[in-house]
Amino acid sequence: MPRPIQAVIHQPALANNLDVIRRKAPDARVWAVVKANAYGHGIRRVFAALRGADGFGLLDLNEAVLLRDLGWQGPILLLEGFFQPQDIALIEQYRLTTAIHCDEQLRMLESARPKGPLAIQLKLNTGMNRLGFHPAEYRAAWERARAMPCVGSIVHMTHFSDADGPRGIAHQVEAFDAATANLPGEASLSNSAAVLWHPQAHRAWVRPGIILYGASPTGRDADIAGTGLQPAMSLHSELIAVQDLQPGDTVGYGSLFTAERPMRIGVVACGYADGYPRHASGWGEQRAPVLVDGVRTELVGRVSMDMLCVDLTPCPKARVGSPVTLWGQGLPIDEVAQASGTVGYELMCALAPRVPTTVATITASDSAAPAVA
């Protein structure tokens, strides 16, 4: 028999989250961002639920080809553009839209000889300082791109650094509007946080990522309470052993947790080789939350490669075989991430290939039925 650990991707939750985004930005078209294999959920697994988007945004050419193989005929945006001149032929073959963010990409594009015009998104650096043309250079870059016979439509694009924080986006929107003033073309500015909290930046296209998967851009689940977003990934396992501890007994590598009273602990078939964070706290003030038999409890001790331990005090009837939820419905991934010094994005993307993954599919009645991925 296989180990009892299993991840579930919930297609109804994905479809719901796309609907939430539509309601938040009713006048914008939606790029569903599926980079990093759909934030660890799997492009194949999420496609059916997200095909109601207006387009898909990603990084990898192979993932773009996969979307075409799955039957997607709509727009696909390469968020980092291309890296080699030979990539341009594939962009044309698979009818992709490409970001252009630097002089090197413009030079490669100038040397290209595609048979038809390519759709591009010209990226403006408004303060993130990763990719994009400086505002003082942007108009010249646009004019250069506009003069190329191989360039069709040009969308103006930027990315917000603080849409989820107190600094906000006003300074970046101001820089964007100044740099693109009187230039024709649509605009794409909003990431997940801007979709939720900055409607003035929605413009023609929005690019939601983390909220498609039901987690918070801030890393705090409380910040998306009331939005209607639902977790699209859950991670489950079972207790494989139970231990009785006496005061002074310690748990796990490094003996970081010491029992202060008689207590029962459960051993769960899940460890850092499955993608659960090794740095999740099982000692001190803020221990990582876990559900056992649907009851909330906490980690004890250090997470090891294949196992972790939990306090069974709140669930005295728990036994070997009792179900465990590591994150998912009833236990937001952001809470686990906070107790691990990271963000939900990282936990999603870190789910290990050895974890069996099933899909709760969308049916005609909009109910969920399990299917093997």
Swiss-Prot record:
Substrate binds at R130, M305. It is an enzyme of class 5 (isomerase). Its EC number is 5.1.1.1. GO terms for molecular function: alanine racemase activity; pyridoxal phosphate binding. Pfam families: Ala_racemase_C, Ala_racemase_N. Its cofactor is pyridoxal 5'-phosphate. The keyword Isomerase applies. Pathway: Amino-acid biosynthesis; D-alanine biosynthesis; D-alanine from L-alanine: step 1/1. Signal peptide: none annotated. The modification N6-(pyridoxal phosphate)lysine is found at K35. The active site is at K35, Y253. It catalyses: L-alanine = D-alanine. One of its GO terms (biological process) is D-alanine biosynthetic process. Keywords: Isomerase, Pyridoxal phosphate. InterPro entries: Ala_racemase, Ala_racemase/Decarboxylase_C, Ala_racemase_C, Ala_racemase_N, Ala_racemase_pyridoxalP-BS, PLP-binding_barrel. Catalyzes the interconversion of L-alanine and D-alanine. May also act on other amino acids. Belongs to the alanine racemase family. This is Alanine racemase. It comes from Cupriavidus taiwanensis (strain DSM 17343 / BCRC 17206 / CCUG 44338 / CIP 107171 / LMG 19424 / R1) (Ralstonia taiwanensis (strain LMG 19424)).
